[in-house]
Curated annotation (Swiss-Prot):
It comes from Neurospora crassa (strain ATCC 24698 / 74-OR23-1A / CBS 708.71 / DSM 1257 / FGSC 987). This is ATP-dependent RNA helicase cyt-19, mitochondrial. The gene is cyt-19. Residues 607-617 have a biased composition (Basic and acidic residues). Keywords: ATP-binding, Chaperone, Helicase, Hydrolase, Mitochondrion, mRNA processing, mRNA splicing, Nucleotide-binding, RNA-binding. It holds the Pfam family DEAD. The keyword ATP-binding applies. Belongs to the DEAD box helicase family. Acts as an RNA chaperone to resolve non-native structures formed during RNA folding to promote mitochondrial group I, but also group II, intron splicing. Functions predominantly by disrupting accessible RNA secondary structure and depends on spontaneous openings in tightly packed RNAs to gain access to RNA helices. One of its GO terms (cellular component) is mitochondrion.
């Protein structure tokens, strides 16, 4: 199989003779360093290769790239890609020009090389790995190039597995893959948590499967179940998408177990394509386990002179008097943005993603603003996405928001990476993010395809110091223009902004358990770096002045033990049978190398250093100036 792909790639080498970045398969740390430097520094003309890729618009190219890289999808036929696949891209999906990551990865992947690619989300990575995956299957079984050709597909003869960190991203990849194989006999199935396993197995056994897209947990479950009927004895390609994210959320063990269920690559060679937005040490370790170090190419599309989204998009931080000021200030911001979109013809329609630190807070925010929408018709429709929803509900919400012209999506971090929501005008984050990287990934949901956007961070005063320490080196400006942010809600004589009463009215109709869940979720570690006693006092003020409760919600004994000796908590008289929702992720430390670097014989280590050279991350001692 592998030989046939290499032979096919060899037939088109004449068409690639002008390619300056041709890489020998001979392993050499020095050679890899030289090539990655060339890839990182040598910029392609912006007119030829658009920086961003999205489903709603594909940038047009007027001239061929000067360095000889294939930049048009129609030219894939010259590389041996089957005409049915090319037609699906150019006619079915309407794409003409490749993005940079597509141009730089498809060609070497078609030659059979393993790929380690550092590329940002929203740059067309999905199509970049789907094309070689599909073509390799067709090369292995030419009858599958046609819709009704070949033998009936089976569930125990999977040829490619694509692993994604989230259900939403896996579903998105599966949807794109089905568009690509529409004119072929290749069958695509998805396997994600939050859906009925038996229903997926029944469908897969009935239809068969050539490409299986899934999340690590569900894939490990299926492959480890000897009665599932899911197997991949002739697996030819393995794809790891958003590798850094999979490791961040703790899927390392599942990934290791999945590999144990796959054929030994020493007996049955397979191609591995690994994509990651960042290349920290744990990703390098992952690559070392999965990638053939004698036959791989490291592609880096993040350049030293590139203006990144978090450097380009205007960003503002709004310090608030207390937790109870956050929703009124957010409502004020939304109303101002709506007015701007109505009066400024050049402004995007208001379409916002609001990131909140816990699942319970996502549910509460959506419930409150949904009631505000019923009362004030100018407030756009709202949705929420979080881990407590079924996969069908999450997919429905994502699709509706994606297709909406205007709206507000309240979300936990399940949508922070990978999901492509077009024309998002605002990303609003409440409370301090778990780390600088997550702040940047959330912000990346706006400003896509070089469109305008804004980032807003709304934090109470007790989190301001932690925000300064956690978010250095970012162009975040302090904004004190929102009136609701500075109001002292505890002052009964104060002339409060009307938004405070609007929020109280909406909260008065919410169920008691929702307040208890939200209150407890903040005590579960969602806000690291905040003094526990100050946090309890702040939450009690929120309960009284923001939710209108006479006393704070009672908490379980286990939370009391976790909090230690703090004042102001009420304890439940008996253990509640239902656990609070969404305790939220804790702060994760970063393990960046320190001290002078030395040249290594390990090509993966050199790739790491080259990638980290472009990450202009400030030192830990620096603080933001807002």
């Amino acid at each position: 199989m592998r030989t046939s792909v290499l032979r096919q790639a060899g037939l088109c080498r004449a068409a690639l003779a002008a390619r300056h970045l041709q890489i020998s398969s001979k392993p050499s740390a020095a050679l890899l360093s030289q090539v990655t430097r060339a890839i990182a520094v040598q910029s392609l003309p912006s007119a030829s290769l658009p920086r961003f890729y999205s489903a709603e618009a594909t940038a047009q190219s007027n001239t061929a790239a000067s360095n000889g890289l294939v930049t048009r999808f129609a030219d894939l036929a010259a590389l041996g890609v089957h005409e049915n696949v090319v037609r699906a891209i150019t006619h079915g999906m309407g794409y003409e020009n490749m993005t940079e990551v597509q141009s730089m990865t498809i060609s070497p992947a078609l030659k059979g090389k393993d790929i380690v690619a550092q590329a940002k989300t929203g740059t067309g990575k999905t199509l970049g790995f789907l094309v070689p995956v599909i073509q390799k299957i067709i090369t292995q079984d030419p009858d599958l190039a046609h819709r009704f050709g070949g033998k009936r597909a089976r569930s125990d003869d999977i040829r490619a597995i694509i692993i994604s960190p989230t259900r939403e991203l896996a579903e998105q990849i599966g949807e794109e893959a089905r568009k690509l194989v529409k004119g072929t006999g290749i069958i695509v199935q998805t396997a994600v948590g939050g859906t009925q396993k038996n229903a997926m197995l029944y469908k897969t056994r009935q239809q068969g499967c050539h490409i299986l897209v899934g999340t690590p947990g569900r894939l490990n479950d299926l492959l480890s179940d000897s009665h599932s009927g899911i197997d991949a004895p002739r697996l030819s390609t393995l794809v790891l998408d958003e590798a850094d994210r999979m490791l961040e959320v703790g899927f390392n063990e599942e990934l290791r177990q999945i590999i144990n269920y796959l054929p030994d690559r020493k007996v049955l060679p397979r191609q591995t394509l690994l994509y990651s937005a960042t290349i920290p040490k744990d990703v390098v370790g992952l690559a070392r386990s999965y990638i053939d170090k004698n036959n791989f190419e490291f592609v880096q599309t993040v350049k030293a002179d590139e203006v990144l989204t978090h450097d380009r998009i205007p960003q503002y931080i709004v310090p608030c008097k207390g937790f109870e000021n956050i929703y009124p200030a957010m409502l004020e911001l939304i109303e101002k943005a709506l007015n701007e979109s109505r009066t400024n013809p050049e402004a995007l329609p208001f379409k916002a993603i609001v990131f909140l630190p816990t699942t319970a807070e996502v549910i509460m925010a959506n419930a409150i603003f949904k009631r505000l929408q019923w009362k004030f018709k100018h407030i756009p429709k709202t949705w929420d996405i979080h881990s407590k929803l079924t996969q069908n509900a999450r997919t429905r919400a994502a699709d509706e928001f994606k297709n909406a012209r205007t709206g507000i999506l309240f979300s936990s971090d399940v949508t922070a990476r990978g999901m492509d929501f077009p024309n998002v005008s605002h990303v609003i984050q409440t409370h301090i993010p778990p780390n600088r990287e997550q702040y940047i990934h959330r912000l990346g949901r706006t400003g896509r395809a070089n469109k305008p956007g804004q980032g807003w961070l709304i934090v109470p005063d007790i989190e301001l110091h932690a925000a300064r320490s956690r978010l250095p080196g970012l162009p975040i400006k302090r904004n004190d223009e929102l009136e609701c942010a500075s109001v002292n809600a505890a002052d009964s004589g104060a002339d409060k902004h009307a938004n405070f009463q609007h929020i109280l009215d909406a909260a008065s109709r919410l169920p008691e358990d929702l307040f208890k869940d939200c209150y407890s979720s903040y005590l579960g570690g969602a806000l690291q770096g905040i003094d526990r006693q100050a946090l309890v006092y702040a939450l009690n003020d929120l309960a009284k002045f923001g939710w209108g409760l006479e006393e704070p919600p009672a908490v379980r004994q286990s939370i009391m033990k976790h909090m230690g000796r703090v004042q102001g908590l009420r304890v439940e008289t008996r253990e509640h049978s239902m656990r609070p929702m969404g305790s939220g992720p804790g702060h994760r430390r970063d393990f960046n190398s320190r001290g002078p670097r030395r040249q290594s014989d390990d090509p993966f280590e050199n790739a790491l250093h080259r990638a980290q050279d472009l990450d202009r991350r400030p030192t830990r001692r620096q603080q933001a100036s807002f």
